[in-house]
Amino acid sequence: MSNKQKIRIRLKAFDHQVLDQSAEKIVETAKRTGAKVSGPVPLPTEKEIITILRAPHKYKDSREQFEMRTHKRLIDVVLPTPKTVDALMRLDLPAGVDIEIKL
């Protein structure tokens, strides 16, 4: 691969502990194969709040709120080698982590 290329990896998950473990696994794999790694950089957490009525009929003043937090991390693999790309493609990560890879 050329020297100007970099791989940008964005990770998303609802559980921040699983997300951090996955990010650490990616960084460790990339460093072991000889690539320079920048990150993991924590991105802002999205918080989606849903408000519903507690009662099925009336009592509008009684409501309940639920929230769903989406945690995100960004990892840049600078100067990736073909060995690095192959190792990252074969990496097994948990099911709760969404991965976006841009070359």
Curated annotation (Swiss-Prot):
Q: Which family does it belong to?
A: Belongs to the universal ribosomal protein uS10 family.
Quote the gene name from the UniProt entry: rpsJ
Task: Name the source organism.
Answer: Ruminiclostridium cellulolyticum (strain ATCC 35319 / DSM 5812 / JCM 6584 / H10) (Clostridium cellulolyticum)
Entry keyword Chaperone: no
Q: Which UniProt keywords apply?
A: Ribonucleoprotein, Ribosomal protein
| NCBIfam families in UniProt | PRK00596.1, rpsJ_bact
Task: Tell me the domain of life.
Answer: Bacteria
Please give the InterPro entries that the UniProt record associates with this protein: Ribosomal_uS10 (IPR001848), Ribosomal_uS10_CS (IPR018268), Ribosomal_uS10_dom (IPR027486), Ribosomal_uS10_dom_sf (IPR036838)
* Protein's UniProt name: Small ribosomal subunit protein uS10
Looking at the Swiss-Prot or TrEMBL record, what is one Pfam family this protein matches?
Ribosomal_S10
Q: How does it assemble?
A: Part of the 30S ribosomal subunit.
Listed GO biological process terms: translation
The role this protein plays is: Involved in the binding of tRNA to the ribosomes.
Annotated GO molecular function terms are: structural constituent of ribosome; tRNA binding
